[in-house]
């Protein structure tokens, strides 16, 4: 399954965008694509990544609603939302 270390590593380049807004960097969008490939086809992987994203969002109080738009801004369709309030058990 996906580990929080993998998720954190993928999205670390996005911290500036997530806390300050603007446009995500190329490295950030590469990380989003990497996250997409990690969470591809298996429900347990998607749920694990969801829980990691939820924990990460809670750690960084400055994260704006920009997190929800991150995958869209990078042109990547993620199967896992980046949010503090997602019920990860409902992800299929």
UniProtKB/Swiss-Prot annotation:
Question: Taxonomically, which superkingdom?
Answer: Eukaryota
Which InterPro entries does its entry note?
A: Bifun_inhib/LTP/seed_sf, Bifunc_inhib/LTP/seed_store, Plant_nsLTP
Q: Name one GO molecular function term.
A: lipid binding
Q: Which SMART domains match?
A: AAI
* Pfam families, sorted: Tryp_alpha_amyl
Q: In which tissues is it expressed?
A: Expressed in seeds and, at very low levels, in pulp of fruit (at protein level).
Indicate yes or no for the key word Cell wall biogenesis/degradation: no
SUPFAM superfamilies associated with the record: Bifunctional inhibitor/lipid-transfer protein/seed storage 2S albumin
GO BP terms: namely: lipid transport
Which UniProt keywords are given for this protein, alphabetically ordered? Allergen, Disulfide bond, Lipid-binding, Transport
Which Cys-Cys disulfides exist here? Answer: 4-52, 14-28, 29-74, 50-88
Q: Write down the PANTHER family for this protein, in alphabetical order.
A: NON-SPECIFIC LIPID-TRANSFER PROTEIN 2-RELATED (PTHR33076)
The UniProt similarity line reads: Belongs to the plant LTP family.
Biological function: Plant non-specific lipid-transfer proteins transfer phospholipids as well as galactolipids across membranes. May play a role in wax or cutin deposition in the cell walls of expanding epidermal cells and certain secretory tissues.
Protein name, entry field: Non-specific lipid-transfer protein 2
């Amino acid at each position: 399954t996906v580990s929080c270390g993998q998720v954190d590593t993928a999205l670390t380049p996005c911290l500036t965008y997530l806390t300050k807004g603007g446009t995500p960097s190329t490295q950030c969008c590469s990380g989003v694509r990497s996250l997409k490939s990690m969470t591809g086809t298996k429900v347990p992987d998607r749920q694990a990544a969801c829980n990691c994203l939820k924990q990460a969002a809670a750690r960084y109080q400055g994260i704006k609603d920009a997190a929800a738009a991150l995958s869209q801004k990078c042109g990547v369709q993620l199967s896992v939302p980046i949010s503090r309030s997602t019920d990860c058990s409902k992800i299929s």
